[in-house]
């Protein structure tokens, strides 16, 4: 799917069903990574991967994230698509889109989706600040916190979509799941 001109993906459409999801916040210097539990309810931080200067499917950052996808036996990867509040895209969106395309080639057939990530880094920074983490202390974990926010938003929307019967796929929540 070419995301250059279209909007972000919708959770629940062509849903792969139960399994872990990996959330990715692509920055120009670092990449935040988060994972969900197998039931797709809760997102938690995994690690921060340094961006590599190399570009291509075998670049160290792509390889590390592909290893995480395999290690966690992920059924889906969610990459944040930064947009302005008006839905416009700038350089950050282009960086994320190109990265997602490279990752998609590396982890195929695992689907790589793009999720709206307006204000996730701002929200993550505010949450860290409110929990007492200094601005200097935020740097190593801000990208992970943003990845958690991206993935948790996807999981919450997926839950609403699946419960509404809007999956377009074989999505199922666990018994008693919401």
Swiss-Prot record:
Keyword Nuclease: yes
Record GO biological process: rRNA 5'-end processing
The protein's name in its UniProt record: Putative pre-16S rRNA nuclease
Enzyme class: hydrolase
Keywords, in A-Z order: Cytoplasm, Hydrolase, Nuclease, Ribosome biogenesis
InterPro entries: RNaseH-like_sf (IPR012337), YqgF (IPR005227), YqgF/RNaseH-like_dom (IPR006641), YqgF/RNaseH-like_dom_sf (IPR037027)
Keyword Hydrolase (UniProt): yes
Principal localisation: cytoplasm
UniProt similarity note: Belongs to the YqgF nuclease family.
The EC number(s) this enzyme carries: 3.1.-.-
Originating species: Rhodococcus jostii (strain RHA1)
Family annotation (SMART domains): YqgFc (SM00732)
Superkingdom of source: Bacteria
Subcellular location: Cytoplasm
Protein role: Could be a nuclease involved in processing of the 5'-end of pre-16S rRNA.
One MF term in the entry's GO annotations: nuclease activity
